[in-house]
Amino acid sequence: MAILAFQKPDKVLMLEADSRFGKFEFRPLEPGFGITVGNALRRILLSSLEGFAITTIRIDGVEHEFSSVPGVKEDVTNIILNLKQVRFKQVVEEFESEKVSITVENSSEFKAGDIGKYLTGFEVLNPELVICHLDSKATMQIDITINKGRGYVPADENREYCTDVNVIPIDSIYTPIRNVKYAVENFRVEQKTDYEKLVLEISTDGSIHPKEALKEAAKILIYHFMLFSDEKITLESNDTDGNEEFDEEVLHMRQLLKTKLVDMDLSVRALNCLKAADVETLGDLVQFNKTDLLKFRNFGKKSLTELDDLLESLNLSFGTDISKYKLDKE
């Protein structure tokens, strides 16, 4: 059954943008869609984007987080609290984790920037953050492990990275998003004033541009919703190949190829010719070559041109092998 057309934006307007803040506008939206889209994007942005954070530390002479370090003003608990705030940006793609050993001496302060001096694959984004204060003669040896993750992970779940009894797991704040706000306002389309405008503000730690963060959040939502829209996808299989995996492009193509031709804007003549040949969906149509179609009863070049224009507008073409999309799989 054809879906009635929705009033929706044809593009996203970026009102403001730099490396840490972006303001975006979506308009027009159907009544009620502002809060639906805004809330979904906000939750995904805050909870589901990937980032990098410290997962474990080891300090010479320290056995647990309730200890203190000789010559250091802060106890280990406060040192950990400060280390949790250090933000990292990946600068070498091959590096998804890194472990460094740092010696702090002849300094009254240990800052986040001191960690950056030892790193190869990452950049510290807040180098002025003070981790702890030291006496003039104090020395501290600390090992730090950085890993890739998503959202927030408590210390207990980071115990898998502990390779020694004196290694201390810490809470990891992976999310690169600092804050997300959205507002829904009325918007006028011609004579109707009950449409909506969604304004979304995204603040990041600088490891990802707000525009890219928005795109990643949208991809996550699209991927999950596409699973609901394809009733033929099964998550479990008795085949020896095990579970099937579908990327976003395959999911999109499956949905597109299952579209019925009667729902497309085709002439009655073309539809009747195709129906007589049992060609009912886009998937049926794209399997034919142009010469095959011209053999259909009452099918002429005008109808062929009409179908050719339709497929071109959908980035499809005649003579396509659709076997990899498994349209007949139950």
From Swiss-Prot:
Q: What is its EC number?
A: 2.7.7.6
- Whether Nucleotidyltransferase counts among this entry's keywords is yes
InterPro entries, alphabetically?
DNA-dir_RNA_pol_insert, DNA-dir_RNA_pol_RpoA/D/Rpb3, DNA-dir_RpoA, RBP11-like, RNAP_asu_C, RNApol_insert_sf
One GO molecular-function annotation for this sequence? DNA binding
**Region annotation Alpha C-terminal domain (alpha-CTD): residue ranges?**
248-330
Q: Name one GO biological process term.
A: DNA-templated transcription
Q: Where is this region: Alpha N-terminal domain (alpha-NTD)?
A: 1-232
Among SMART domains, the record links this protein to: RPOLD
Give the reactions, separated by semicolons, that this protein catalyses: RNA(n) + a ribonucleoside 5'-triphosphate = RNA(n+1) + diphosphate
Matches recorded under CDD domains: RNAP_alpha_NTD
State any GO CC term: DNA-directed RNA polymerase complex
Question: Known Pfam families for this protein?
Answer: RNA_pol_A_bac (PF01000), RNA_pol_A_CTD (PF03118), RNA_pol_L (PF01193)
The answer to whether keyword Secreted applies is no
Q: Kindly state which keywords UniProt assigns to this record, in alphabetical order.
A: DNA-directed RNA polymerase, Nucleotidyltransferase, Transcription, Transferase
Domain comment in the entry:
The N-terminal domain is essential for RNAP assembly and basal transcription, whereas the C-terminal domain is involved in interaction with transcriptional regulators and with upstream promoter elements.
Spell out the family assignment given in the record's similarity comment. Answer: Belongs to the RNA polymerase alpha chain family.
What does the function comment of this entry state? Answer: DNA-dependent RNA polymerase catalyzes the transcription of DNA into RNA using the four ribonucleoside triphosphates as substrates.
Subunit details: Homodimer. The RNAP catalytic core consists of 2 alpha, 1 beta, 1 beta' and 1 omega subunit. When a sigma factor is associated with the core the holoenzyme is formed, which can initiate transcription.
User: Could you tell me what this protein is called?
Assistant: DNA-directed RNA polymerase subunit alpha
Which organism encodes this protein? Bacteroides thetaiotaomicron (strain ATCC 29148 / DSM 2079 / JCM 5827 / CCUG 10774 / NCTC 10582 / VPI-5482 / E50)
Taxonomically, what lineage is the organism?
Bacteria, Pseudomonadati, Bacteroidota, Bacteroidia, Bacteroidales
The protein's gene is named rpoA
